[in-house]
C-alpha cells in the first residue's frame, strides 16, 4: 500500500462524518513494521515503547499518564461505546506498557449486523462528538508500504417484509440495529442536517488517508457500498456518504450509493401523535410510550398494520413507574409540649386539650401529603413519653392474662402448623371493649381514639372513601428470632386501604434487638427500614403498593395495628363473601349424605382451631354508621366506659403519676393517686375528643379546607430527620 500523500491528510472540512470515524477507528489495518506513532493528546511522535495504550479498548495511545488522564473525558464515551457494543476483542488484556505492539485498532469482524449499526448510532448520539473541536491533533498518522490486505466482510441487515414476524428480545430486536426511533422522534430534517454538520466539523482530526487503505478489489467496493447503505439508514448526510466511495480508488466496478431512506416526521397541532416514514414502513406514535404502530405499504396489497413493544433492557426499572427518592420523606416529630409552646409564642393561649386537637390536624396534613406522594408516613411522639409506657404495660398485662393466641394466615387451612410458624410467629389479640378482661386498658382506648381523629381529616383528601375500620390488633413478637416474612396486607381487595401501626418499645436498638419493619414501596428502588421505636405511628397503603416484612426479633416487640376500610371495596367483599356462603350452604343442602344430626356430631368431634386473621377481621369489623353522609367514628361501647361521678378533669390529668420529668409532666398530681383515677382521666380525655369531633362535624359544611382556615402555620423549629 502506498503512503498517503500530504495533501490527502488534510480532509475537507465539510465532508468528515460518522463514516470517517467508523472507518478510521474500526477498519484501519496499518502495518506495524513501519508505523510512526503519535500521542493522542499532544500529537508528539514517540516510539512504541514510550506509548501507553488504553487498557480498555486499545484504540488510542499516550506518551504519559498525565495526558491519558486529561484526554479521558473526551475518550471515555467512545471507549465505553466500544465495550458495551462488544467491539473489544476478548484477547485484549490490560498491559502496563507494550513494547512491540503499536496502539492500533484491533482487528474486528463485523459479522453481527446489530453490533455494527448499534455502534454507529451510539457514536452519532455521542454528546462529546457533537461538540465542535478546532485544530485537534490527529490521533495517529500511518506511513506504510504497499501491500495487499484482505477485505473485511460487512453484513447489512435485510429489510423486514410486511408478512414477517418481528422478533423481540431484551438484548436487541430487529428494529433496534438500523432504525433507532429515538433518532427520528424529536428532530426535524433541518435539525438533522445541522446536527450532521456540527458532527462532521468535530471530526477534523480524522484523516482521509485512512480511506486509501481499502483494497481496490471488487469485493471491497461491494463492502463499501453496503457500508454506505448502513450509514444512510443510520441517518448520515449525503455529503458524508460520498466520502466513503469517492475516497476509494475506482476500478472496473463502480460503487453506487443508494439514495438515503425517506424519513418524514409529521405531528398534529396538539402533539399527541407522530408519524415517521422510513422506506415503505410508517411508524405511528401512540399515547403509550411502550407501544408503536407500524404500517407497511405494498404495491397492490392492502396496508398491513401491527403493533410492537419497544425493546427495554431486562435489567432496567419499569418505565411506567415514577420512581422517587423516599429518603426525602420527612418524619413528623414535634411533641405536644413543643406544639403548645409554639402556639403560645404566637399569642394563642390554648389549653392542653385544644393544643392536642390542633396538633392532630397538623399530623393529618403531614400524613396526607406523605401518603399521596410516597405511599407511607411516619409520626413520632404521637402519645407522649408517659402514655406509651403505660400502653406497653397494658399490652404486657393482657398477654400475661392469656388473651393472646398465635397469629394465623388467611390461607392457614392449606398449611400445617410448622409452616405457619415459619411465616408468622407472633401472638395477637383483637382488642374488644366487651371483654371484661381488657377493661382496664384505658391507654389503648385513648390511642385508638386519637388515630381515629387523624383519619377523620382524610375525607376527600385521598383516593379512598373510608367507611370503617377493624378492631385494634395487639401483637407481641417474642424475642426468640420470630419474624413475619414479606407479604401484602390486602392482596385480594377485602376492603383494607390504610394500615396503621403503633409501636411502644422503649429503648429499642435496631442493631441488637432487630424487629425492623422493612417496607418495599412501589415507587422506591430500595427498601425502607423503619425501626419500631417507642411512640412511633406508621401509616401506609394496605394493597400491593407496599409489600413489607418484619425482620427477626430478639426482644419482646409490641405493636398495635388498625386497618381502615374503603367503603365501596368493603361492601363488594362482603357481598362476595355472602354469595360464597350461600353457594356452600345450598351445596350442603343438596347433598343427601349430610344431615343436621351428622353436622352436629361432626362439629362436636371436630378439633377446634384458632380462627384465621381473615375470619377475625370479618367478625371484629366495626363499620361507621351509614345513616349520615359524613363518616362518623364508632362510639365507645357501654362496657368500655368508666363511671365518672365528677366533671371533666383539669389539664393536669394528662400526666401520669409516675412521671418525674418536669419538662414532660404538666401537672402537680399527687403520686398517691391510684390507677383507677388515671383510668378515669384518660376516659374523660377520650370522651372530650369525641365531643369536640362531633361539634366540628356539626359546624363544618364542606371539606377539611374549612377547618384549616385561620390556623397558624406549623412550627418552624420542627426537628426533622430522614429514615
From Swiss-Prot:
Supply the domain comment: The MYND-type domain is not required for oxygen-mediated hif-1 degradation or for inhibiting hif-1 transcriptional activity. Susceptibility to S.aureus infection requires the Ser-rich region but not the MYND-type or Fe2OG dioxygenase domains.
Work out whether the entry's keyword set contains Zinc-finger: yes
Q: Where is the composition biased (Low complexity)?
A: 249-270
Positions contributing to 2-oxoglutarate binding: 557
Its induction note reads: Induced by hypoxia.
**Which parts of the sequence are annotated with region: Disordered?**
249-275, 294-323, 678-723
What residues does Fe cation bind to? 487, 489, 548
Domain of life where this protein originates: Eukaryota
**Outcome of mutating residue 487 to A:** Loss of hydroxylase activity resulting in loss of oxygen-mediated hif-1 degradation. Inhibition of hif-1 transcriptional activity, which is independent of egl-9 hydroxylase activity, is only slightly affected
**Residues holding Zn(2+) 1:** 39, 42, 63, 67
The protein's annotated catalytic reaction(s) are:
L-prolyl-[hypoxia-inducible factor alpha subunit] + 2-oxoglutarate + O2 = trans-4-hydroxy-L-prolyl-[hypoxia-inducible factor alpha subunit] + succinate + CO2
Task: List cofactor names only.
Answer: Fe(2+); L-ascorbate
Q: Which UniProt keywords apply?
A: Cell projection, Cytoplasm, Dioxygenase, Iron, Metal-binding, Nucleus, Oxidoreductase, Vitamin C, Zinc, Zinc-finger
| UniProt remark on cofactor binding | Binds 1 Fe(2+) ion per subunit.
Protein name stated in the entry? Hypoxia-inducible factor prolyl hydroxylase
Q: What is the effect of changing residue 720 to K?
A: Loss of interaction with cysl-1 associated with a loss of hypoxia-mediated inhibition of behavior adaptation
Enumerate the SUPFAM superfamilies for this protein.
HIT/MYND zinc finger-like (SSF144232)
Report the EC code(s) recorded for this entry.
1.14.11.29
How it assembles, according to the record, is: Interacts (via catalytic domain) with lin-10 (via N-terminus); the interaction regulates lin-10 subcellular localization; the interaction is direct. Interacts (via catalytic domain) with swan-1 (via WD 1-3 repeats); the interaction may regulate vhl-1-independent hif-1 transcriptional activity; the interaction is direct. Interacts (via C-terminus) with cysl-1; the interaction is enhanced by hydrogen disulfide and activates hif-1-mediated transcription; the interaction is direct.
> What function is annotated for this protein?
Cellular oxygen sensor which regulates the stability and the activity of hypoxia-inducible transcription factor, hif-1. In normoxic conditions, hydroxylates hif-1 targeting it for vhl-1-mediated proteasomal degradation. In addition, regulates hif-1 transcriptional activity in a vhl-1-independent manner and independently of its hydroxylase activity. By regulating hif-1 activity, controls several cellular responses. Mediates susceptibility to B.thuringiensis and V.cholerae pore-forming toxins and enteropathogenic E.coli.
Expression by tissue, per the entry, reads: In larvae and adults, expressed in pharyngeal and body wall muscles.
Question: What sequence ranges are listed for the domain Fe2OG dioxygenase?
Answer: 468-566
Q: What happens when the gene is disrupted?
A: RNAi-mediated knockdown causes enhanced resistance to polyglutamine or amyloid-beta-mediated paralysis and an increase in adult life span. In addition, causes resistance to B.thuringiensis pore-forming toxin CryA21-mediated toxicity.
Amino acid at each position: 500500500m502506498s503512503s498517503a500523500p500530504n495533501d490527502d491528510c488534510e480532509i475537507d472540512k465539510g465532508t468528515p462524518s460518522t463514516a470517517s470515524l467508523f472507518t478510521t477507528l474500526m477498519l484501519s489495518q496499518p502495518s506495524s513494521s513501519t508505523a510512526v506513532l503519535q500521542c493522542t493528546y499532544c500529537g508528539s511522535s514517540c516510539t512504541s515503547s514510550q506509548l501507553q495504550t488504553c487498557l480498555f479498548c486499545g484504540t488510542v495511545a499516550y506518551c504519559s499518564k498525565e495526558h491519558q488522564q486529561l484526554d479521558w473525558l473526551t475518550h471515555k464515551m467512545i471507549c465505553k461505546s466500544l465495550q458495551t457494543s462488544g467491539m473489544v476483542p476478548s484477547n485484549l488484556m490490560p498491559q502496563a506498557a507494550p513494547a512491540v505492539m503499536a496502539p492500533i485498532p484491533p482487528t474486528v469482524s463485523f459479522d453481527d449486523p446489530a453490533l455494527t449499526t448499534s455502534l454507529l448510532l451510539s457514536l452519532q448520539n455521542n454528546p462529546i462528538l457533537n461538540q465542535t473541536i478546532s485544530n485537534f491533533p490527529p490521533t495517529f498518522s500511518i506511513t506504510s508500504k504497499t501491500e495487499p490486505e484482505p477485505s473485511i466482510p460487512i453484513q447489512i441487515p435485510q429489510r423486514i417484509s410486511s408478512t414477517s414476524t418481528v422478533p423481540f428480545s431484551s438484548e436487541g430486536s430487529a428494529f433496534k440495529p438500523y432504525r433507532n426511533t429515538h433518532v427520528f422522534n424529536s428532530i426535524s430534517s433541518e435539525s438533522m442536517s445541522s446536527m450532521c454538520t456540527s458532527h462532521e466539523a468535530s471530526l477534523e482530526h480524522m484523516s482521509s488517508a485512512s480511506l486509501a487503505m481499502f483494497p481496490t478489489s471488487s469485493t471491497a467496493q461491494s463492502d463499501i457500498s453496503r457500508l454506505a447503505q448502513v450509514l444512510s439508514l443510520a441517518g448520515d448526510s449525503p455529503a458524508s456518504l460520498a466520502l466513503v466511495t469517492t475516497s476509494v480508488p475506482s476500478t472496473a466496478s463502480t460503487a453506487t450509493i443508494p439514495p438515503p431512506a425517506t424519513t418524514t416526521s409529521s405531528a398534529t397541532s396538539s402533539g399527541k401523535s407522530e408519524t415517521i416514514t422510513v422506506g415503505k414502513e410508517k411508524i405511528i406514535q401512540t399515547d403509550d410510550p411502550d407501544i408503536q404502530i407500524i404500517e407497511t405499504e405494498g404495491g397492490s396489497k392492502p396496508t398491513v398494520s401491527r403493533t410492537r413493544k419497544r425493546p427495554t433492557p431486562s435489567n432496567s426499572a419499569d418505565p411506567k413507574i415514577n420512581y422517587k427518592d423516599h429518603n426525602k420523606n420527612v418524619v413528623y416529630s414535634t411533641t405536644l409540649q413543643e406544639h403548645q409552646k409554639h402556639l403560645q409564642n404566637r399569642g394563642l393561649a390554648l389549653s392542653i386539650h385544644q393544643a392536642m386537637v390542633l396538633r392532630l390536624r397538623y399530623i393529618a396534613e403531614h400524613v396526607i401529603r406523605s401518603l399521596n406522594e410516597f405511599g407511607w408516613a411516619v409520626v413520632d411522639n404521637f402519645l407522649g413519653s408517659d402514655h406509651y409506657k403505660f400502653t406497653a404495660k397494658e399490652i404486657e398485662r393482657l398477654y400475661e392474662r392469656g388473651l393472646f393466641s398465635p397469629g394465623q394466615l388467611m390461607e392457614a387451612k392449606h398449611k400445617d402448623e410448622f409452616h405457619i410458624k415459619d411465616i408468622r410467629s407472633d401472638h395477637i389479640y383483637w382488642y374488644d371493649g366487651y371483654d371484661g378482661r381488657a377493661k382496664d386498658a384505658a391507654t389503648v382506648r385513648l390511642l385508638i381514639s386519637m388515630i381515629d381523629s387523624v383519619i377523620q381529616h382524610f375525607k376527600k383528601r385521598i383516593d379512598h372513601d373510608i367507611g370503617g375500620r377493624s378492631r385494634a390488633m395487639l401483637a407481641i413478637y417474642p424475642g426468640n428470632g420470630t419474624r413475619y416474612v414479606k407479604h401484602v396486607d390486602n392482596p385480594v381487595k377485602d376492603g383494607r386501604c390504610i394500615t396503621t401501626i403503633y409501636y411502644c418499645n422503649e429503648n429499642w436498638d435496631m442493631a441488637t434487638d432487630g424487629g425492623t419493619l422493612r417496607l418495599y414501596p412501589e415507587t422506591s428502588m430500595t427498601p425502607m427500614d423503619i425501626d419500631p421505636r417507642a411512640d412511633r405511628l406508621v401509616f401506609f397503603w394496605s394493597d400491593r403498593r407496599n409489600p413489607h416484612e418484619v425482620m427477626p426479633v430478639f426482644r419482646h416487640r409490641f405493636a398495635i395495628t388498625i386497618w381502615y376500610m374503603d367503603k365501596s371495596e368493603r361492601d363488594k367483599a362482603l357481598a362476595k363473601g355472602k354469595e360464597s356462603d350461600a353457594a356452600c350452604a345450598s351445596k350442603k343442602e343438596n347433598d343427601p349424605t349430610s344431615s343436621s344430626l351428622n353436622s352436629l356430631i361432626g362439629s362436636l368431634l371436630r378439633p377446634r382451631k384458632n380462627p384465621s386473621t381473615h375470619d377475625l377481621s370479618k367478625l371484629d369489623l366495626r363499620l361507621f354508621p351509614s345513616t349520615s353522609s359524613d363518616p362518623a367514628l364508632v362510639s365507645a361501647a357501654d362496657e368500655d366506659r368508666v363511671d365518672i361521678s365528677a366533671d371533666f378533669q383539669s389539664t393536669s390529668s394528662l400526666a401520669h403519676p409516675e412521671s418525674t420529668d418536669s419538662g414532660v409532666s404538666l401537672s402537680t398530681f399527687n403520686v398517691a393517686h391510684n390507677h383507677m383515677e388515671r383510668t378515669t382521666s384518660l376516659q374523660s380525655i377520650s370522651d372530650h375528643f369525641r365531643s369536640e369531633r362531633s361539634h366540628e362535624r356539626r359546624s363544618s359544611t364542606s371539606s377539611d379546607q374549612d377547618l384549616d382556615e385561620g390556623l397558624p402555620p406549623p412550627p418552624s423549629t420542627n426537628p426533622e430527620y430522614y429514615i
